[in-house]
């Protein structure tokens, strides 16, 4: 279960967006965004893995593609730029 703190940020100052945009809290109740350093994820079965890698099911597959830490970064940049979405690359 996650709660997005993006609600209510419409019209927020850039400083607030830089700190608060894209934050999603997990069921763990962390105070700050966790850093997901994992490189891969566990799947319940091969069918679930195939659906995720095929883009048929939402969820993480491999950190080089996306992970919650990168998603928070992308959402924060999109909010700062006033865009719908952003893509983080290196």
Please name every model-derived segment.
Residues 47-90:
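Conserved N-terminal alpha-helix of the aminotransferase class I/II PLP-enzyme fold
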Residues 1-60:
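N-terminal glycine-rich, Lys/His-bearing helix-loop that initiates the first secondary-structure elements
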């Amino acid at each position: 279960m996650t709660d997005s703190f993006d609600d209510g940020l419409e019209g927020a100052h850039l400083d607030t967006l830089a700190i608060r945009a894209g934050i999603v809290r997990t069921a763990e109740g962390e105070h700050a965004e966790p850093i997901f350093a994992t490189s891969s994820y566990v799947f319940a079965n091969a069918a679930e893995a195939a659906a995720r890698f095929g883009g048929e099911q939402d969820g993480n597959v491999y950190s080089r593609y996306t992970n919650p830490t990168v998603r928070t970064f992308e959402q924060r940049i999109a909010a700062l730029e006033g865009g719908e979405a952003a893509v983080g690359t290196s």
